[in-house]
Amino acid sequence: MNLHEYQGKQLFAEYGLPVSKGFAVDTPEEAAEACDKIGGGEWVVKAQVHAGGRGKAGGVKLVKSKEDAKAFAQQWLGKNLVTYQTDANGQPVSKILVESCTDIDKELYLGAVVDRSSRRIVFMASTEGGVDIEKVAHDTPEKILKATIDPLVGAQPYQGRELAFQLGLKGDQIKQFTHIFVGLAKLFQDYDLALLEVNPLVIKKDGNLHCLDAKINIDSNALYRQPKLRAMHDPSQDDAREAHAQKWELNYVALEGNIGCMVNGAGLAMGTMDIVNLHGGKPANFLDVGGGATKERVTEAFKIILSDSNVKAVLVNIFGGIVRCDMIAEGIIGAVKEVGVKVPVVVRLEGNNAELGAKVLAESGLNIIAATSLTDAAQQVVKAAEGK
């Protein structure tokens, strides 16, 4: 689950980290009022969406009057912002962050992720702030500095000082950076985060450090023990199909192809997508119905897949272990009848009662193509999607 920038900065402030004075507003009038509350003669206004690249898309602007702040809010509130990280529809803007202006001397980067190989929280810092850190890591990996956090003792001040020295910070800046580093590490652990970024972490003209941005991603598996963060969830930023799938405990990720995939098991689902690609097809989604694939869940899975107008054929690949293939076959038949599937459906069943499942499908009288193997299934569904 992602947080908006203004929500991330609220958490930063709770941990005593330096952030700009600002207000999240949802009307143009409140945007003008926020300028009065903040004071000064210049403000930064930012459209709040769960996507990067807002500045280039016109979603971030420096304004010099309350009227300009109000006009910016009128321009974006209730509209969709399209950036390089969104699809063609963009994401809806329901909040505008109005902030005080910051005099920037230099931009740094500071972030943290859970490193799966070391099973530790790893902090990354760089002098290349304000740009895409993935590009920095690819082009100039030597510019990425790292500090691994021991889960037994947590982040240590000496690690912050070491990073600060390597970043070229001096004097009181080292103390400030260490405070930010330790605070972010505590926040990361306290709130079960999966990713945290301050990009950029800036050195102001007066020499002080300042968190100019906040990107936070929470481990969704830990939300049950983070009620405060659950309450911050903005469902308007979620893909509608993915939100529907979550309600039915289906693992769904929308993609850009035209072949819908329904599979039980994440590994088998990835393998299915690979073999579809191998035979010239493009998957429209990743969908794992899990081990408890009931008729109801299969029906909802079909609804989700077919809500994508790009889908020209559906491949159902089930390995029957705990779940019997004949029961899955009945679920598929019921779902096809209920949903009114108009595109070709290719089904490959293997494992527990696979032959009986194939027989049930054959006797259904529906336009369901039974495949004899995974390769056959991939070839059949690619042909079907091409109208052959």
Curated annotation (Swiss-Prot):
Claim: ATP-binding is one of the keywords in the record: yes
SUPFAM superfamilies xref list: Glutathione synthetase ATP-binding domain-like, Succinyl-CoA synthetase domains
Cofactor comment text: Binds 1 Mg(2+) ion per subunit.
Residues covered by the ATP-grasp domain: 9-244
Pfam family, one: Ligase_CoA
Binding site for Mg(2+): 199, 213
Cofactor: Mg(2+)
GO terms for MF: ATP binding; magnesium ion binding; succinate-CoA ligase (ADP-forming) activity; succinate-CoA ligase (GDP-forming) activity
Record InterPro entries: ATP-grasp, ATP-grasp_succ-CoA_synth-type, ATP_grasp_subdomain_1, Succ-CoA_synthase_bsu_CS, SUCC_ACL_C, Succ_CoA_ligase-like_bsu, Succinyl-CoA_synth-like
Binding of ATP, residues: 46, 53-55, 99, 102, 107
Residues given in the record as substrate binding sites: 264, 321-323
Pathway in which this enzyme or protein is active: Carbohydrate metabolism; tricarboxylic acid cycle; succinate from succinyl-CoA (ligase route): step 1/1
GO biological process: succinyl-CoA metabolic process; tricarboxylic acid cycle
Reaction catalysis annotation: succinate + ATP + CoA = succinyl-CoA + ADP + phosphate; GTP + succinate + CoA = succinyl-CoA + GDP + phosphate
Protein name per its UniProtKB record: Succinate--CoA ligase [ADP-forming] subunit beta
Organism name: Pseudomonas paraeruginosa (strain DSM 24068 / PA7)
